Amino acid sequence: MNSLLMITACLVLFGTVWSEKGYLVHEDTGCRYKCTFSGENSYCDKECKSQGGDSGICQSKACYCQGLPEDTKTWPLIGKLCGRK
C-alpha cells in the first residue's frame, strides 16, 4: 500500500516539474498576449489551451499559462523586445 502511494505521489510530482508556466508571447513581435480583467479569463484560458497548456488566467494585463509543453516559448523572448529597439 505504501509503495502504491509513493508511486502515485511521484507521478503527480513528475507532471508538475516537467510542465512549463509563463506568459504567452507572439513570436513575431515578442509581445505578450494582452488581456483586460485580472483573474479567471476565458480568452486567456482558450489561448493557453490552444498552445497545449492546462489553463490560463489574466495576470498583469497579460495571459499567464500553467502546464504548457516544454517547447512552448514564453515571455521574454531573447532579441524581441515588443516594439522597442
Curated annotation (Swiss-Prot):
Biological process, per Gene Ontology: defense response
Keyword Lyase in record: no
Keyword Disulfide bond in annotation: yes
Alphabetical list of InterPro entries matching this protein: LCN-type_CS_alpha_beta_dom, Scorpion_toxin-like, Scorpion_toxin-like_sf, Scorpion_toxinL, Scorpion_toxinL/defensin
Gene Ontology CC entries for this record: extracellular region
Modified residues (Cysteine amide): 82
Subcellular location: Secreted
Pfam assignment, any one: Toxin_3
Tissue specificity statement from the Swiss-Prot or TrEMBL entry: Expressed by the venom gland.
Classification via CDD domains: neurotoxins_LC_scorpion
Comment block on domains: Has the structural arrangement of an alpha-helix connected to antiparallel beta-sheets by disulfide bonds (CS-alpha/beta).
Function according to Swiss-Prot or TrEMBL: Beta toxins bind voltage-independently at site-4 of sodium channels (Nav) and shift the voltage of activation toward more negative potentials thereby affecting sodium channel activation and promoting spontaneous and repetitive firing.
Name under which the protein is recorded: Toxin CsE8
